[in-house]
Structure formats: C-alpha cells, structure tokens
Amino acid sequence: MAKQNTKRDFLVALMNNKSDFRIAKEQNWYRIPCSTKMMPKSVANKTLKYIAFYHTKIFNKDAYSVRWFGEVKNISVVKRKMLFPEITNDPKAENEYYKIEFNSLIELPAPIISNRPRRLLFISTTFGHFQNAKNINDLFYGSPIEEEFWKAIKFENIEAERQYLINTDEKLFYLDFAIFCKERNINIECDGDRFHLSEINVKRDKNRNNILSSLGWSILRFTTEDIRKNIHKTLGYVKETINRYGGIEIISDKTYRYFKEDNNQINLFDY
C-alpha cells in the first residue's frame, strides 16, 4: 500500500477580489505579498503543489466556499511592476510578491462549503484532506490528537469550527475548536503533552485562558490521554458543557440542540 502523503503542499488561499479571480482563471497566477507575516511555508520554500481559492461574500452565491483549484507549475519572486506593467505611477511598484503560476483551474463537482461565514487567509493542508473535504473544517490538517478529536466530534454530530480566529486588542488567537452555544461559546484546546505541558507554555495558556474568559468564552483543555484513552468521558464533558450553555447552535436551521445524557442521542429544540 502506498504511503499517504502528509505534507502540507496544498494551499487554500483567500480570494476576495473579482479582478484577482479573473486573473486566476484567465492568466493562471495568484500573488502573495512577500511582506505577509503568516506566509505559508510551502510558498516560501517553493514546495507547493496545488492551490485552491476560498471565496468571500463579494462572490454572492459562491460566497464562503471553495470551488476551484489548480496544479502549481512555478513560484517566483517578482516586483509588482512586473505583475501589472499597465499601471503607471504605482506607489507599490517596487513591492515584491510571490507569484504562484498554475495550470488551468479545475472546478469541483461539489463545492466545499463553510456553514458559518468566516474570513480565512490561508489553509495549509494535504491533497488527501482536500479530496475528502465536504465542509471547510475538513480541510484543516492539525496535530494527530486534533485530527482524532475532530473525527470523534464529527461522529457525535457536534458542530464545531476549526482554527477559529479571535482578534483582540492584545493579539490574535486561533482556537483549535470553537463551539457556538445559545448562552456562551466554548473553546476546546487539544494540549499535546510535549508542547503544552512545558512551564513557559503553561503560563502562556493561562494568560490566553484569562483573555478569552474575559471575552465570554468557556475553555476546555484536553490532553493526549483524554483524547486517546478516555474519549467517551471527554465527549461527555463536551456535551454537558454544551447543554449547560443552552445547546449548540445549528447555523443551517437557526436552532439549538441539546444532548441527552442517557443515550447520547441528539434532541432538537427550536427557539
């Protein structure tokens, strides 16, 4: 059996401009400013093999979805004046960009949808994740325990957003999992033993918890053992917390769902 490719050589990039999408479809290239702070590694080291585009609300009926992708041919660093020679007196003319060139874009038979409107800059993932994704959250390729936890909550029909961005006055936070409830939202973090249990990261996590709590979030943290050896108990904590905060929000039908404690089946209540 062939070994599954686990390299993050597939990039889903933000597409928030119709003229840029026209360039992507007609001229087969996309640009990223070299000054971008969160530059995908696969772009910087030129190992990117595929690129897809996440459309924002400007695309109307195609908003918040991934519908097009292409195979990357070349990545180069060029100045803006080379990308847009027709623009005169451009104050950004000397700015440098990664120019990602690709084969003709291919339209997916069925789009990958985000149920909740989200602004996503980049998702670095694998071709396998892209092939199997039905929802935008399926695209994310996290740590092994994050992947295991995602499969577990999907099986239990617990709707969550992965790598959900919280922008505060102090800094940006990406939540491993965000669950939206009627009374209070829940942040779930999967704490790998090696990283999160070191002294410096324990202090960082406590500070992070305090900031999120002040914003009204409830935080649950689970270790590798919680997820790999005690997943049934861990999911029980999650369901109890959801029930405590008024049920989980279901975007598609604007309802809230509770979980029964006796048989783990979902009960639906409309508000």
What feature does the model see in each segment?
Residues I87-P91, S104-P111, I186-R194, I242-I250:
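Short, Lys/Arg-enriched charge-dense amphipathic segments
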Residues R8, R22, R31, R67, ...:
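Arginine residue identity/basic-tract feature
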Residues A2-L139, S143, E147-E161, N167-K171, ...:
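Structured alpha/beta reader/binder surfaces that contact nucleic acids or chromatin modification marks
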Residues G70, G128, G142, G192, ...:
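Residue-identity detector for glycine
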Residues K182-E183, I200-Y271:
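Basic, glycine-rich
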Residues D138-S214, S218-R228:
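Surface segments flanking catalytic/ligand-binding clefts of nucleic-acid enzymes
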Residues K81, I113, I188, S198-E199, ...:
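Generic domain-boundary/flexible-linker signal
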